[in-house]
């Protein structure tokens, strides 16, 4: 399994985290890419 940052979950080699924030799709995707993991909106 992937080593994930604290507070993140690993599943099939990828790290995931749920954020309960109200954002538009564009703002949410931007927020995800700004995370330390350089993620994407799923």
Swiss-Prot record:
Example of a GO MF term: toxin activity
Subunit structure: Heterodimer of subunits alpha and beta; disulfide-linked.
Keyword Chloroplast: no
Family per similarity comment: Belongs to the snaclec family.
Keywords: Calcium, Cell adhesion impairing toxin, Disulfide bond, Glycoprotein, Hemostasis impairing toxin, Platelet aggregation inhibiting toxin, Secreted, Toxin
Post-translational modification note: Glycosylated.
Record domain C-type lectin: where: 1-42
Cysteine-cysteine disulfides: 4-15
GO CC annotations, alphabetized: extracellular region
Major location (coarse): secreted
Role: Binds to the platelet GPIb/IX/V receptor system and inhibits ristocetin-induced platelet aggregation in human platelet-rich plasma. Strongly inhibits platelet aggregation induced by ADP, calcium ionophore, thrombin and collagen. Does not inhibit U46619-induced platelet aggregation.
Name recorded for this polypeptide: Snaclec lebecetin subunit alpha
Known tissue expression: Expressed by the venom gland.
InterPro entries hit by this protein: C-type_lectin-like/link_sf, CTDL_fold
Organism: Macrovipera lebetinus (Levantine viper)
Location of the protein in the cell: Secreted
Cofactor(s) this protein requires: Ca(2+)
SUPFAM superfamilies referenced in this protein's UniProt entry, alphabetically: C-type lectin-like
Keyword Kinase in record: no
